[in-house]
């Protein structure tokens, strides 16, 4: 699977992202880029989560997936990665937003 460059002028650029203040001029994506235009909710939190935080994240994420809501998170340790893992275990779709390139 090769990374895809999505420029702001491209029809593939996520529509909702166009309306934020200072949207990125380009995105690098890997995987199914169609889900970038589907409804999703960001689930983020502490890297040093508590057991309660983990339990609530799993419950919240599982419920969102049951309603076909995509999970968006940063892929960091803690709550972010718990959200992604829970989403995938429940057959959901997930988007990981990385602060740097795909090779890092």
Label every PLM stretch briefly.
Residues 1-66:
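Short, positively charged patches
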Residues 61, 68-72, 76, 80-104:
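Phosphate/pyrophosphate-binding betaalpha-module
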